[in-house]
Amino acid sequence: KTLCAGYSAQLPPDVLAIPNLANCSGGTTGKTKVIEQDMPAGESDEGLRTWFSVSGMRFEMRQLLAGPLFHGAPHSAAFNGLYCGNTLVMPAKLDAETIVRLIKKYRIEYVQMVPTLMQRISRMPGFRKEDLASIEVLCHTGGVCSQDLKREWLEIIPPERLYELYAMTECIGMTSIRGDEWLRHPGSVGKMHCGRVAIRDEDGREVPHGEIGEIFMSWGDNSPRVTYKNMPPLPVDSEGFRSVGDMGYVDADGYLYFADRRSDMIVTGGENVFAAEVEMVLKKHPKVVDAVVIGLPDPDWGHRIHAIVETNAPVGSKELIRFALNYLPPYKIPKSIEFTDHIPVNENGCLLYTSDAADE
């Protein structure tokens, strides 16, 4: 306070002509990208109003930051929490045990987390939903949340207090859905806010409702100027539509459903397999804590499906394959399964898609 007392709170006008925000992407499949975004005057206020409506955050809550501040989603949650006068608790570690312990210790009311962390918490030995009794709002984002995991958490957090956001650091668009609305549209990530979403095929043509294609989004006239640092910008068409390579579909009511990243689609024997679909099935098994599915080169299949699995009790490959056959056709079943004590996650709590097997 003594140091700051001798300085004006006002910045000279030429120091920050246009407020700018820089965040890092998740970096789960490669080098993290630094993404810069201009924030013209007034835009931050409008963004905050949108945030309150889609995330469930209120003023003066006890808030836990379950992610690093250099990543977009935790940074936004922290910034907006400070704006709301929230008390912010910042964990030294982002493992499931630490998060649950701090929620109980500080009686946390608001928390935002990734589905990977939700899965690890629910698979903790001795976990009880009473451990999270203080939570008034939980908002999840930053990865695929299976329907089974979502329903599991809807038994822990009441539907009207569980929010889901689908967005990306590139700020091309955002959808959201609350738990009670999700129960009417299971599997959906919600509707687009302040803009439009289009699903297109490889030739750029829009596809019918219910058909999977590449997700394009546009804020219209409200699109922020977003650039990668030291990388080419995302292509944008005349209507402002851009894509980060996610795949999904829109139903007749305008609800968006996420399938997977285009780069995570495995072509095996001429068939397209989304890694996320196989991962979600494997994670249904009660002994599976986490699973990652990748495609490995194969002389017969082009690529074979390989799973890396973390378990909390002994289980064999044959048992998991038999289990998966209850939900998936044979061509989507892993041809090989690798067991590990711990699937690595990055600082954001998102799975890192790396394995010794990937070097084969």
What is the meaning of each model-derived region?
Residues 203-204, 328, 340-355:
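Flexible lysine-rich "adenylation lid" loop at the C-terminal edge of ANL adenylation domains
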Residues 23-26, 83, 109-110, 126-185, ...:
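Gly/Ser/Thr-rich phosphate-binding loop
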Residues 25, 353-359:
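Conserved small/polar residues in nucleotide/adenosyl-binding loops
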Residues 191-192, 205-236, 255, 271-273:
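Conserved ATP/PPi-binding loop(s) of AMP-dependent carboxylate-activating enzymes
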Residues 103, 111, 239, 245-333, ...:
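AMP-binding/adenylate-forming catalytic core of the ANL superfamily
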Residues 6, 13, 20, 34-58:
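Conserved structural elements of the adenylate-forming
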